[in-house]
Regions:
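Short conserved micro-motifs at the rims of enzyme active sites and ligand-binding pockets
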Residues: 99-100, 156, 181-185, 215-217, ...
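Non-catalytic accessory/interaction domains
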Residues: 144, 202, 292, 359-363, ...
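Acidic/His-enriched low-complexity segments
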Residues: 1-240, 266, 371-377, 387-393, ...
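Short, well-ordered loop/turn elements at secondary-structure boundaries
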Residues: 139, 150, 165-166, 238-239, ...
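Short alpha-helical hairpin
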Residues: 57-60, 111, 194-199, 261-262, ...
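Hydrophobic alpha-helical and helix-loop surface patches within well-folded domains
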Residues: 53, 115, 171, 204-466, ...
Length: 843
């Protein structure tokens, strides 16, 4: 086959009949797949992985077929090109990797049960049935599934069940779609159903380990999201139902299978009466994200994985557009600023980072491009920039045209820009190429040169970076009308600054509302002019100042010592975005001090000065009629107060635990994690450890499980940390889907870092076998690099990971993360004394 040629270019399927007989006891699947399609050549190659092929026929004639497990293929010859029917008889395993067809495990009253589900994105449909497992190979699918069925069990799939004959469940034929979107599940389930105004059936399904009321919140959000998107896209939802299913074991956060969306339990089933605002926002945005995909990704699918951003970036933006419309009181775009924008700007500043549009071929490479900070966060930031530039009306007109033109088919990035550009009457292609095809982003340096206001763009790096003279078309979004809409040159000289300043009457600013993906480095006098008016600035502008100063300090373009004395100017804000941004900066200062050192005590004093008044105002409990800002700020402020060892905060947190000793799950959900962490840190014991670990093993509340994980990993007791690490490979205690959080927690704990670091090096082969097949695998390397800050750890990191540089899917991550750690080591060495002195001077 010619390099770069896809399998679909040789054989294009039109319809699959998939019969599966699944035995949970033996963990064996007997399958028979019939594929109708058209071949352009006589040598046919299908995808398969882990399949044992019994027989292959073409138009009723048996052919000799060869499997290649390295290439994940099944190859055979046919007499002549043209229309044909291929039938493959095979067996396949039920996997334990959360990929393909696999069991999820859970308990009810101590009895272990399982729920069978699927996860086929990116390239795991081939583990369930032979196929052209490429996004452009769209076809229709008819599922027929038999299983060792027990009483009270339910089976669901992309489409409604039509009939059951001799124990075989037959489902209606799907619309034309990609293989990775096929899905089904069976086992004991409960559900709640409703219907949209246009007649689409909406359902939420879970195991019976959950209380029925835990499905209500998701049902409401799902129903209203489908209704919102049908209106916003001006394109009807094309399937008869939209099922949402919580799986007990699930590697990703959620998956947009058309008509049967799957989720981690924590992202679907929640007790809305005792869930924090943050948890409700997370669940709502995840649901809205997956349902945005039903159009962006499912109805119109990227031609190949290099345009993954067409799916993920758009869904990431649309989750905020939808939830802002459905829950306007949440001010959800503020969450976008503190989470998506922050993560994108941090990750995208590392040399070697992927561009949003990136070339990939091998399955491991495809999985590795699911970089949340780039394809999701940066990509959505690009689209927010476009939306701001062309307006919502043009965006909606363009999307309607895009869906109409490419429905039930595939598209490339150029197709989207053509549709949006036509609707807006402007050429977006050239501008967006500078953002999507290039990695990184610019810093715009603003200065006054010979009296003239002058702008200059250059690529911004945190750590070492090779300047390749990249240039971006930057939407400047200035508050000074004299500036052009776009900066399309490396430098821009404007008019007399004093005259401009006098005419406008306010300090000069760029990127108003922080909608574009760049940061600004104002010369000291211009920055001071802005800071002199900080109280009159919007919350987003204050966040932006803190965000840009933090990044500039990380990139060593300014000193953190300059930033420290500015923090008090933001400490009394009642905006959650300002508080979040402020304590992100504070969090970054912690790397400059050693645990239990006089320097840490000084930093704690500073943080107490910043947070004490706010903590006294907010306390631990929600007040009547308090704002969303206060609800979101409370855990941020309380966490700061506990870091500061504020006596009132430490003691009152302990009192809360004592009052809820018999049912710690009943602690207020928004502050439960930090209250439990305080208890473990200051009042920890084997008894408390055992109580929390028992709760972790038995609760069906994913939020409570995360809180316990966050708390237990804070212990300074090495024996307890050794116990935690001993459970890393015990799936009865720590599910593989949750392991990364436990690993990260122990690694970030000075008392446990060596234990966790030794574990991952000693048991890397086990980790690779257990989670190496999914897109989360490389993030174990990422989280390690985020924590290490010493030259010794850098040396050890390189010694372990550099021999793995040639491993498919790991090359970029290892290279980047060596740079990340090296940058942090250099920054700490260079800035440590100055930062420590600045902290003392601020007391």
């Amino acid at each position: 086959m010619v390099e770069g040629q896809r399998l679909v270019d040789v054989f294009r399927p039109t319809h699959y009949n998939i019969y599966l007989d699944i035995n949970r006891e033996t963990k064996v699947i007997a399958g028979k797949t019939t594929i109708k399609g058209f071949a352009t050549q006589t040598a046919i190659t299908l995808n398969q992985k882990f399949l044992s092929i019994n027989n292959v026929t073409v138009n009723g004639q048996t052919v000799v077929a060869t499997t290649n497990d390295t290439d994940e293929t099944l190859t055979f010859a046919v007499p002549e090109p043209g229309e044909m029917t291929i039938v493959v008889d095979y067996t396949a395993p039920l996997t334990d990797t959360m990929m393909g067809i696999y069991p999820s495990y859970y308990q009810i009253d101590g009895q272990k049960k399982q729920l069978i589900g699927t996860q086929f994105e990116t390239t795991a449909a081939r583990q369930a049935f032979p196929s052209i497992d490429e996004p452009a190979a769209k076809a229709t699918f008819s599922l027929a599934i038999k299983y060792d069925e027990h009483e009270n069990e339910t089976i669901i799939a992309n489409m409604p069940e039509e009939r059951v004959v001799d124990g075989v469940h037959y489902f209606a034929k799907t619309v034309k779609m990609s293989t990775y979107l096929v899905a089904f599940a069976f086992g004991e389930m409960q559900s709640k159903l409703t219907e949209t105004s246009s007649g689409v059936k909406i359902g939420v399904f879970s195991t019976k380990a959950h209380q029925p009321a835990e499905l209500d919140f998701a049902l409401d959000i799902a129903k209203r999201s489908i209704e919102f998107y049908e209106d916003y896209y001006q394109t009807p939802y094309p399937l008869p139902h939209s099922w949402q299913l919580a799986l007990p074991d699930f590697s990703a956060g959620a998956m947009e299978n058309w008509g049967l969306v799957t989720y981690r339990e924590a992202y679907l089933a929640i007790d809305a009466d005792n869930a924090s605002v943050e948890m409700k926002q997370r669940v709502a945005t995840v649901i809205a994200h997956e349902l945005a995909h039903q159009w962006f990704g499912d109805l119109v699918t990227m031609q190949w994985w290099d345009d993954l951003w067409l799916n993920e970036s758009f869904a990431n933006m649309m989750e905020y557009v939808a939830i802002d419309a459905l829950q306007p009181d949440w001010h959800i775009w503020e969450l976008f600023q503190t989470s998506e924008a922050a993560s994108a700007l941090q990750r995208d500043a590392t040399d070697g980072v992927q561009s949003v549009h990136v070339q990939v071929e091998k399955p491991a490479e495809i999985d590795a491009i699911f970089d949340a900070a780039i394809v999701y966060a940066k990509g959505s930031r690009m689209l927010v920039m476009v939306r701001s530039l062309i307006g919502d009306d043009a965006l909606r007109r363009g999307l309607k045209d895009y869906f109409e033109t490419h429905k039930f088919a595939n598209a490339k990035g150029a197709d989207l820009w053509a549709a949006l550009g036509k609707a807006a009457g402007i050429d977006l292609t050239a501008m967006m190429a500078t953002w999507l095809e290039q990695p990184g982003y610019p810093v715009v340096n603003v200065s006054v040169v010979d009296g003239k206001l002058t702008l200059a763009q250059e690529q911004f790096f945190i750590g070492e970076g090779i300047d390749q003279d990249r240039q971006w078309q930057i939407p400047l979004n200035s508050n000074y009308a004299a500036l052009p809409e776009l900066m399309v040159t490396k430098t821009l000289e404007l008019g007399d600054y004093e005259e401009l300043r006098q005419n406008v009457g306010t300090p000069f600013r760029l990127n108003v509302d922080n909608t574009a993906h760049f940061i600004v480095n104002y010369e000291p006098a211009l920055l001071q002019d802005i800071l002199n008016h900080v109280d009159s600035l919007s919350a987003i502008t204050q966040l932006q100042l803190l965000q840009d100063l933090r990044l500039l300090a990380e990139g060593r373009q300014i000193s953190y010592a300059v930033v420290v004395p500015l923090l008090k100017s933001f400490a009394t804000s009642r905006s959650s975005v300002v508080n979040t941004a402020l304590y992100q900066v504070v969090g970054n200062l912690k790397k400059f001090v050693a645990s239990d050192s006089p320097e840490e005590k000084a930093l704690q004093q500073l943080v107490d000065t910043l947070s004490a008044t706010q903590f006294d105002r907010l306390g631990w409990h929600k007040k009547a009629n308090e704002t969303i800002d206060d609800q979101v700020s409370r855990p941020v402020i309380a966490d700061a107060a506990l870091f500061a060892e504020n006596k009132n905060a430490v003691a009152s947190a302990h009192d809360l635990v004592q009052q809820n000793q018999q049912a710690l799950v009943q602690l207020p959900a928004d502050i439960r994690a930090i209250v439990l962490a305080n208890e473990v840190k200051h009042y920890g014991s084997q008894a408390l450890f055992d109580q929390l670990l028992t709760d972790y093993r038995t609760t069906s509340d994913g939020g409570y499980q995360r809180d316990i994980m966050a708390a237990l990993t804070k212990t300074s007791d090495k024996a307890l940390l050794e116990q935690i690490v001993s459970y890393f490979e015990d799936s009865e205690t720590i599910k593989p889907q949750d392991l990364r959080g436990w690993y990260k927690g122990v690694l970030a704990n000075d008392a446990g870092q060596q234990l966790a670091w030794d574990w991952i090096r000693d048991d890397w082969a086990w980790l690779e076998k257990t989670v190496g097949g999914d897109m989360e695998f490389t993030t174990y390397i990422t989280v390690t690099a985020r924590i290490f800050k010493t030259a010794e750890r850098l040396t050890e990191f390189k010694a372990f990971f550099e021999p793995k540089l040639d491993t498919p899917g790991l090359t970029r991550e290892i290279t980047m993360d060596i740079n990340v750690i090296a940058s942090r080591v250099a920054l700490v060495e260079e800035e440590k004394l100055a930062v420590q002195q600045a902290v003392k001077a601020s007391l």
